[in-house]
Amino acid sequence: MAQNNENALPDITKSITLEAPIQKVWETVSTSEGIAKWFMPNDFQLKEGQEFHLQSPFGPSPCKVLAVQAPTELSFEWDTEGWVVTFQLEDLGEKTGFTLIHSGWKEPNEVIGKANEKSSVVRGKMDGGWTGIVNERLRKAVEE
């Protein structure tokens, strides 16, 4: 997603190849039960425009499904900071290419309300967090 502000922080992008067919990965990233296995408890429903909540460490985060292109792409607004999370899947036969994009970052010194920290600090923590979530938790959820 293009940044509106040239001083904004760059998107977080994580890409991996999963040892599972695309349909299994899609079910894991596009259902409430699947998302809860590797990300956060939620009341997600796969429907464009659907509002839902992720139960984050900072409390419930309001979200809204923006786009669904089964089984290759899902994007949603996350919380009230302007963030958008996108899951992109690529069919590689018995494997699946998976890319997560966390966009909508503000300027480095702008404070993120719930965390009460600068955007640059929150982005740094989330970048590391996404690495573990995608490389370990998502991989385990789809490859077991």
From Swiss-Prot:
Coiled coil: none annotated. InterPro entries: ASHA1/2-like_C, START-like_dom_sf. It comes from the Bacteria. Belongs to the AHA1 family. This is Uncharacterized protein YndB.
